[in-house]
């Protein structure tokens, strides 16, 4: 399929969610391939584009100089004709508490192919339901991308929680690599350290401390390791956040990978449960022997499909998201192939990914 030929993606494939839309539009921008998506979120209620999806699509279009048709709330089809990915400074508002992390997922692949340094400021939710937390993106996602030769900086200026939002995050790519290295994630290597970051904003700092104690206690019990703990809390008169919220990230740094687990608080949910959930997520994934946790098992294949060469991954869980994205990559990226070597849906898995070696256009 030539770069000028339209690729048609059925948005109802697999789980049929917003991740198909975000990933397809990002890939179209990288590949310079016009894209038509039909049946957008057909399995969701209500179907069609929601405001947070529009932000991702419009951000990709702005940075790649692309044209959009059908980019409106409720639309079940969309056409995107990309231009060239340009560096510079951009600013996007995700809405009251739309996930900043999901916008970063959409933008990160194409920022690597920018023709010059690029900086993007995002306003919205940093720690919201149904998405990785911003700390996960900073400590795990960015670390894994660095192992693929891609340095992406994620700086949090202010957190934003549901429903108020108002978080501010700056994403910088000072030296776009123009592609990615193939790399296998099968062996973890020696454990170098475990870390806990617990935050509470517009709330007593004792909540952040209770979350951290709960997470750290479980890590000590299961791993026999004392984690390094960081508490983020604010005095009431110096707290810049718009609304209350809490969250925890627990992450483990190994010689060959980084893995993490996160959780966010909500009204009525004890702080101890928040901390325990984050630690349990990491510890469950570590117990499988995998080198990529459940979140990165979803996200890493996009970069490995664009990389030059063969990568083998051992992921903690082949989620429905990951399975759908692998099929989308096969449709959109000429030359990409994959094989599931072991495991299956919702189980630990090993996969071989043969990347297409995509270079800047």
From Swiss-Prot:
Pfam families: RTC, RTC_insert. It is found in: Cytoplasm. Its EC number is 6.5.1.4. GO terms for molecular function: ATP binding; RNA-3'-phosphate cyclase activity. ATP binds at residues 105, 295-298. The active site is at residue 321. GO terms for cellular component: cytoplasm. GO terms for biological process: RNA processing. Keywords: ATP-binding, Cytoplasm, Ligase, Nucleotide-binding. It catalyses: a 3'-end 3'-phospho-ribonucleotide-RNA + ATP = a 3'-end 2',3'-cyclophospho-ribonucleotide-RNA + AMP + diphosphate. Catalyzes the conversion of 3'-phosphate to a 2',3'-cyclic phosphodiester at the end of RNA. The mechanism of action of the enzyme occurs in 3 steps: (A) adenylation of the enzyme by ATP; (B) transfer of adenylate to an RNA-N3'P to produce RNA-N3'PP5'A; (C) and attack of the adjacent 2'-hydroxyl on the 3'-phosphorus in the diester linkage to produce the cyclic end product. The biological role of this enzyme is unknown but it is likely to function in some aspects of cellular RNA processing. HAMAP family: RTC (MF_00200). Belongs to the RNA 3'-terminal cyclase family. Type 1 subfamily. This is RNA 3'-terminal phosphate cyclase. It comes from Aeropyrum pernix (strain ATCC 700893 / DSM 11879 / JCM 9820 / NBRC 100138 / K1). The gene is rtcA.
């Amino acid at each position: 399929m030539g770069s000028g030929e339209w690729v048609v993606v059925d948005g109802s494939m697999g789980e049929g969610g917003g991740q198909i839309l975000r990933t397809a539009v990002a890939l179209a921008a990288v590949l310079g391939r016009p894209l038509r998506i039909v049946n957008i979120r057909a399995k969701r209620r209500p179907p069609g584009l929601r405001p947070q999806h529009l932000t991702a699509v419009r951000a990709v279009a702005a940075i790649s100089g692309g044209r959009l048709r059908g980019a409106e709330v409720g639309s079940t089809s969309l056409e995107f004709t990309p231009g060239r990915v340009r560096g510079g400074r951009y600013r996007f508002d995700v809405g009251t508490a739309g996930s900043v992390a999901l916008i970063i997922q959409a933008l990160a692949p194409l920022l690597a192919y920018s023709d010059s340094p690029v900086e993007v400021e995002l306003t919205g939710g940093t720690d919201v339901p149904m998405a990785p937390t911003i700390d996960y993106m900073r400590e795990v996602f960015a670390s894994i991308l660095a192992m693929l030769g891609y340095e992406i900086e994620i700086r949090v200026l202010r957190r934003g929680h549901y429903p108020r939002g108002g978080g501010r995050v700056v994403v910088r790519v000072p030296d776009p690599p123009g592609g990615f290295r193939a790399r296998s994630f099968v062996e973890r290597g020696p454990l170098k350290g475990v870390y806990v970051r617990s935050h509470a904003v517009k709330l007593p700092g004792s909540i952040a401390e209770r979350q951290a104690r709960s997470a750290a206690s479980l890590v000590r019990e299961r791993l026999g390791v004392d984690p390094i703990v960081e508490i983020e809390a604010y005095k009431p008169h110096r707290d810049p956040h718009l609304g209350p919220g809490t969250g925890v990230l627990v992450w483990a740094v190994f010689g060959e990978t980084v893995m993490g687990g996160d959780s966010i608080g909500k009204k009525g949910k004890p702080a101890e449960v928040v901390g325990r959930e984050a630690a349990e997520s990491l510890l469950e994934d570590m117990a499988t022997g995998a080198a990529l946790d459940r979140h990165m098992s979803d996200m890493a294949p996009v970069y490995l499909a664009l990389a030059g060469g063969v990568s083998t991954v051992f992921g903690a869980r082949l989620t429905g998201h990951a399975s759908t994205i692998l099929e989308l990559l096969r449709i959109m990226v000429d030359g990409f192939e994959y094989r599931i070597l072991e495991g299956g849906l919702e189980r630990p898995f090993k996969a071989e990914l043969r990347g297409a070696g995509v270079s800047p256009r």
